[in-house]
């Protein structure tokens, strides 16, 4: 049952507006109505400039520092510090559930829904261990970000055709077998409507080849915080919900789709839980 908008208070419930155009009832429209011009000013003139400033300064400082010692571990520390600053800037407290039940001393693949550019800072702050991220090749074109992805040992994967990324796959398998966890975004990109998109089966190729368990992770609230195609950051509480590991034993590249569906259902179930549960 539809609710009339404020401007149409006198319109009969469920009736067509006089203009013949129904108000936008999409998730993004609902979010936009909740956060007005004051929120936009705060975002455009405080949050966004501070985030860019922190990113540029730390990005420049990290270049010479990364030449010392093991570059992946040093740059992970920089990424974590950068993420902590961003989370303080955007004033979005995050609740984590389920992580304390995991044995994080063993290598695992974390399958995470991707709703926002700010998913990355959330993961760096609230996953309290070194990890690497599987990412799309297109990200290498971004200044500073692309350089860090190359230097920090992140994994560039073609999720549509994993065999085309054989060098990266070998490096990722080596990392997993050495005990370094991997974070993947199986949707292949950010959602445009806040819902968990279908997963690309190829995203699970590494987990199957390495025979390591997959942990479903749902980030809740990051879409409303900063959806695609906008710089308007809307402060709000967030949740990171971590599920039980899903074994890859018995799966092969031939039946990756079955594993993909199983993990997708687990992430969707976590994401759909009422807030606070």
Language model features by range: what are they?
Residues 1-34, 38-41, 166-277:
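Non-catalytic C-terminal accessory region of glycerolipid acyltransferases
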Residues 30, 43-51, 79-135:
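Conserved H-X4-D acyltransferase segment
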Residues 33-95, 147-151:
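A transmembrane-helix-recognition feature enriched in membrane-embedded lipid enzymes
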Residues 83, 154-158, 189:
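Short, basic, glycine/proline-bearing loop/turn elements
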Residues 97, 134-136, 158-159, 186, ...:
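Thr-Gly-centered strand-to-loop micro-motif
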Residues 115-171:
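Membrane-embedded segments
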